[in-house]
Regions:
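Cap/insert and terminal regions of metallo-dependent hydrolase folds
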Residues: 83, 88, 98-124, 226-288
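Active-site metal-binding loops of divalent metal-dependent hydrolases
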Residues: 32-33, 79-81, 137, 212-214, ...
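Active-site environment of divalent metal-dependent phosphoester hydrolases
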Residues: 137-143, 162-163, 215-218, 237-240, ...
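Glycine/small-residue-rich hydrophobic helix-like segments
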Residues: 192-247
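Metallo-beta-lactamase
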Residues: 1-140, 147, 153-209, 227-233, 255-275
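Hydrophobic/aromatic beta-strand patches that form the interior of the parallel beta-sheet core
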Residues: 28-30, 75, 133, 155, ...
Length: 288
């Protein structure tokens, strides 16, 4: 486990300048299953509009994203579910702690189709990922890691690997030999975001600090043509939740709630300023 040092890149002064250097990067967003649970399990009830029932159940997609870089090869953003969620429903390869939590909160994982898991998707499209960038260390984002080769390079925020994360992720990282920590405090500001890192130094992939849901949650921008895409992970729950100004959950108390609000404000400001950039979510098959 080591801290990743991003190469020095071009000194961009704003996102418009970044977008002017966009490259054609083939990419896909794909769903690996669903999480079925009440809205109040995933968001702050005090932020719900009157037409949203906190106890209403939704099936939330468990998304992963793939793109191909001209020199760094195939890259994933998050991993979704592996095949165990179809073979051993409803909790697949989740840790004991996650099974207890999901049982108490009446949450279930659904993968009714046996070929939508991460491994099946990669095999079907003949993809061997060289790199995986994680938005955060929650099990529904790391549960596909066992389907990947041990030498796959894995990246996530430096402050994520706390005891809680280890309990939630269980054995998802078992055997993985190349883990890199992203120190977002070294990143500069590109308004409206306070800390961003040009990960490859060529303007193609950016990590963006969006803490709150977890302490070092990250969003990622893929600078592709004709339209860049911003993957916000769980900093925003879904497209409709963002439109309703619903705030995601946090286990970090008042500090976490303040960070969730600040991160949501930055994402919503970015969307208002750059409406042509597609906003993608970890739990929605639709984008804004």
């Amino acid at each position: 486990m080591q801290t990743y040092q991003a190469p020095n890149g071009k000194p961009y002064r704003g996102w418009q300048a970044v977008f002017e250097d966009a490259q054609p990067l083939p990419w896909t967003a794909f769903n690996t299953g669903y999480i079925s649970g009440a809205l109040q399990n995933n968001a702050q009830p005090e932020s719900f509009p009157s037409h949203r029932d906190p106890t209403e159940r939704y099936n939330y997609a468990v998304m992963a994203f793939h793109f191909r870089h001209p020199t760094h090869g195939d890259i994933l953003i998050d991993t979704g579910f592996d095949r165990t969620f179809h073979e051993h429903p409803p909790y697949g390869n989740l840790s004991f702690a996650m099974r207890v939590y999901y049982t108490l909160t009446k949450v279930q994982c659904i993968q009714s189709n046996g070929d939508i898991d991460l491994g099946s998707y990669l095999k079907r499209h003949q993809i061997t990922p060289a790199h995986v960038f994680l938005t955060h260390l929650h099990a529904d984002h790391t549960a596909g890691l066992p389907a990947l080769p041990s030498q796959t390079h894995i990246y996530y925020g430096k402050q994520e690997w706390a005891l809680m994360s280890r309990l939630l992720c269980g054995n998802h990282f078992a055997g993985k030999s190349s883990i890199h920590l992203l120190d977002m405090s070294t990143g500069g500001a590109l308004a409206p975001f306070s800390h961003v890192v040009d990960l490859f130094g060529d303007g193609t992939l950016w990590a963006i600090s969006t803490p709150g849901h977890t302490r070092d949650h990250l969003a990622y921008l893929i600078n592709t043509t004709p339209t860049p895409i911003l993957i916000v992970g769980d900093a925003e729950l879904t497209s409709w939740a963002m439109q309703d100004e619903i705030l995601v959950s946090t286990v970090d108390g008042a500090r976490g709630k303040e960070q969730v609000q600040r991160s949501a404000n930055m994402i919503r400001s970015f969307h208002a300023t750059y409406p042509d950039v597609q906003i993608w979510f970890s739990h929605d098959e639709d984008h804004l």
